């Protein structure tokens, strides 16, 4: 990092050229502001406010999901399970948006999302009742429960992949077994009703699998042609590759070289549109 020092009369102005930050994942934004110690015999620093010089680090995590869960708790008049350190005012606004939910999901619930639980809400009297809360700020991408963004170790254990596989070998495994993996991702995502909220579009939907004669409709992924974006472009898979059906994106795999995470996210709204007979969607 290069420092530029400019002196104007008795006032010393220190400006720092900041490196352009690397693009971070959507769900984590790190904002850092710091002023490095400047050592120059011509620059006086004894009168500089120490609060300005002291490095600060502010971490803004993906909080929409937590606010959404709090809003549901407020709507149903139940306790939020865990620590909540986000805006109650914004949660209240979301609660007002959820008004019609109780008309279509009239169950007594308890909040059960703590510690990465598979279900965000469970029936208080009937524990077979489950509800998953899914949010997106704008792009419509959501992760499956449990295995949506695991470490390499957890991914390998879950899919019975050799832990010694390199990331390139894991990519090859995904390409060769994508239909089987989508079956698993699908089952973990839609094993209970989903309350989906797209903040930018103001889309609020209760989504569940269509039930015909007591059986939930599913998708036979083995009969569907799935295309990877990097293959369509005749390029190698670097970090991200989307999967599509008839040129419509339905999901995305992300494998970063410098992060211990093998991530999959559904293009949720596209998935609902491509398979309309598979889902029952109630717009709220």
Roles of regions detected by a PLM:
Residues 1-9, 30:
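Primarily low-complexity, compositionally biased regions used by nucleic-acid-associated proteins
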Residues 15-35, 39-284:
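Nucleic-acid endonuclease domains
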Residues 7-12, 45:
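Ala/Thr-enriched low-complexity intrinsically disordered regions
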């Amino acid at each position: 990092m290069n420092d530029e020092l400019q002196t104007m009369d008795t006032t010393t102005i220190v400006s720092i050229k900041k490196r352009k930050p690397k693009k971070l994942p959507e769900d984590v934004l790190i904002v850092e502001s710091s002023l490095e110690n400047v050592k120059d015999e011509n620059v006086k620093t004894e009168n500089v406010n120490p609060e300005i010089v002291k490095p600060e680090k502010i971490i803004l995590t993906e909080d929409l999901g937590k606010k959404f869960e709090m809003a549901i708790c407020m709507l149903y008049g139940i306790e939020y399970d865990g620590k909540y350190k986000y805006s109650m005012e914004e949660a209240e606004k979301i609660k007002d948006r959820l008004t019609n939910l109780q008309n279509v999901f009239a169950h007594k619930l308890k909040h059960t999302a703590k510690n990465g639980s598979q279900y965000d809400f469970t029936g208080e009297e009937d524990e077979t009742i489950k509800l998953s809360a899914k949010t997106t700020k704008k792009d419509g991408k959501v992760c499956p429960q449990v295995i949506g963004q695991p470490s390499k170790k957890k991914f390998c254990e879950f899919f019975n992949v050799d832990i010694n596989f390199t990331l390139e070998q894991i990519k090859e495994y995904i390409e060769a077994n994508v239909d089987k993996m989508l079956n698993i991702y699908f089952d973990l995502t839609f094993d209970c009703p989903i309350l989906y909220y797209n903040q930018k579009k103001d889309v609020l939907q209760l989504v569940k699998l269509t039930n015909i004669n007591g059986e939930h409709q599913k998708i036979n992924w083995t009969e569907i042609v799935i295309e990877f974006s990097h293959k369509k472009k005749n390029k190698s898979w670097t970090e991200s590759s989307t999967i599509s059906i008839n040129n419509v994106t339905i999901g995305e795999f992300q494998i970063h070289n410098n992060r211990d995470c093998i991530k999959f996210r559904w293009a949720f709204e596209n998935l609902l549109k491509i398979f309309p007979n598979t889902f029952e969607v109630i717009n709220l």
